[in-house]
Design a protein with these regions (language model features):
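Cytosolic regulatory regions built on CNB/CRP/Popeye-like sensor folds
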Residues: 1-194
């Protein structure tokens, strides 16, 4: 079975190769080129001890992504998340008409795909690189082996950091929805006649 999407072959957009191919194409950095100091600066790893940061920095691969590459696709199976070290990416959702709409921008220290670590569902959105980017790939197996089986406290902190970010995103979404619904109500509310 091919990883290629015939619908996107004619466009300038590319899809991220399968995991084995990605491992061969990690670019200028070795797959294990992280440092504990780099991870410490990212909120996802907040509160983790030095030893755990050391284990993660040795185990988590870095991937170099070119402009136009679709890192993940809405609806695809998912078992990994990504942390942005460098670059700029856009998060896209399909509208009811089928058009893709940008719903967020991602830059250094952002992460995406975390829901796949928690709920084992298909991708809820697509992510495409707008600039050359360097990403850390964290699979469910990494979380299990490096955190859950090794140190339950570290695992709990990691999941709590994800929960905090999901809560922040939900608050932003609630605010946007309230603003939108208020605007719709103003336009379509019956006018009082005097």
């Amino acid at each position: 079975m091919s990883d290629r999407d015939p619908k996107s072959e004619s466009s300038a957009e590319t899809r991220l190769p399968s995991e084995p191919a990605r491992r061969r194409e990690t670019g200028r950095l070795p797959p294990r080129g992280l440092s504990p100091d780099t991870l410490r600066e990212i909120g996802l790893f907040g509160g983790l001890d030095e030893e755990t940061l050391g284990v993660l920095s040795r185990e988590l691969p870095i991937e170099n992504i070119t402009v136009g590459t679709r890192v993940v696709n809405e609806g695809d199976p998912a078992r990994e998340m990504f942390v942005v070290l460098e670059g700029e990416l856009e998060v896209l959702k399909k509208s009811p008409s089928g058009a893709e709409v940008r719903v967020a921008m991602l830059g250094p220290s952002s992460w995406f795909g975390e829901m796949s670590i928690l709920d084992v569902q298909s991708r809820s959105a697509s992510v495409r690189a707008l600039a050359p980017s360097r990403l850390v790939r964290i699979s469910a197996e990494h979380v299990d082996r490096c955190l859950y089986r090794r140190d339950l406290k570290a695992y709990a902190l990691f999941v709590m950091n994800i929960a905090r970010e999901l809560s922040r995103r939900l608050r932003v979404t609630d605010s946007i929805l309230a603003h939108f619904m208020g605007s719709v109500a103003e336009v379509y509310a019956p006018k009082k006649r005097g």
